[in-house]
Amino acid sequence: KCWLTSQEAGRLMGIGSELVRSAVITSEIVGKVSIKGQNRFVSVHRDVVETVRQNRLLYVTTTEARRRLGVSKLVFERLIQSGALEKKTKAQRPALVSAEFLAKDVDALVSRLLEGVLPRQIEKSLWAGFQDISIKRGIPDASICVIMQKILHQEIRPIALLPGASGVSGLRFDFSEIKACIAEDEPEY
């Protein structure tokens, strides 16, 4: 069977049949609309369904991206603000894809940060994770984004990785190195 109803297509794609019907009617995806009396029947070719299904697998939601990174909402937002990941707009995504981040970008970010670990022996009280780069630890809000960018560009490299932590949540940085960055950024009067 090459042509599928909107219900069958929706089930295979992992979305509601109403979205499939709407996408065909608005020509967002290719399909057939046949009108019989008062009823409008929508059918979608199996190849189109498979293409949409594959496209949907390439993207991850914000929640899934955070889970893969192993970070809180606040840390995730700071990573986004510092340019770690590009949030795709609806126009940049394929038809019927609602997730905003490319899965390969998220995985590449995790790999890049984990590969950047440069082990050094320092006192554990000076260790800081992503969650510690905050106002609570004495870092001004304006400097947080700059520090995150330096971490992303590997100007500040992690000194340790806690075993068993998911994503980048186990990375530990030298807090004195982070504090030194703040001193560099402070304007001199």
Predicted regions and their residues:
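Intrinsically disordered, low-complexity regulatory/linker segments
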Residues: 1-189
